Design a protein with these regions (language model features):
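Conserved alpha-helical scaffold segments that buttress catalytic/binding sites
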Residues: 2-152
Length: 152
């Protein structure tokens, strides 16, 4: 298993950060991908194509909350039982406003409904679960605002 830490840069938000060059961190410029800010259309499948060669092992940073749905994309690359741990300051399980598109607000609900590999820690189907609030992340500057963990 190769560990690849990824920085997915959609809006150049990381340009002001003093991130040292490191062979174990892959900086991926995604600013050329269209139709992916807040809502992700089918044309933005390019995101999955760019992540796939690196795999999902490692720590991944993606821009802002507008791109939280990238976690959902990553779950599609795993073909074994997984648990999803989600800490966020807003729900990612809303009903979609636009059915054909995935948003930063509805991706987790879609993963729960569609990913056959997603299970609770006691191997009960997630479809039997009620949504739970796992925590509240402060919105202060310089603080991580959301944490998504895929366990398998």
């Amino acid at each position: 298993m190769t560990t690849n830490h990824l920085i997915l840069d959609f809006s150049h938000v990381y340009c002001d950060e003093k991130i040292p060059k490191n062979d174990k961190v892959h900086w991926m410029d995604c600013s050329d991908i269209t139709e992916c800010d807040l809502y992700c259309s089918k044309r933005a499948e390019e995101i999955r194509a760019r992540i796939a060669p690196y795999g999902i092992h490692g720590i991944h940073f993606w821009d802002s909350g507008n791109y939280h749905y990238v976690t959902g994309i990553m779950t599609t690359l795993i073909k074994q039982k997984i648990s999803l741990i989600l800490l966020d300051h807003h729900t990612d399980m809303q009903k979609p406003m636009i059915e054909q598109m995935t948003s930063c607000g509805d991706w987790a609900g879609k993963v729960i409904k569609t990913n056959p590999w997603l299970v609770r820690s006691r191997n009960k189907p997630v479809s039997d679960c009620q949504p739970m609030v796992y925590g509240n992340i402060p919105r202060d500057g310089g603080v991580i605002r959301a944490f998504h963990c895929i366990r398998y």
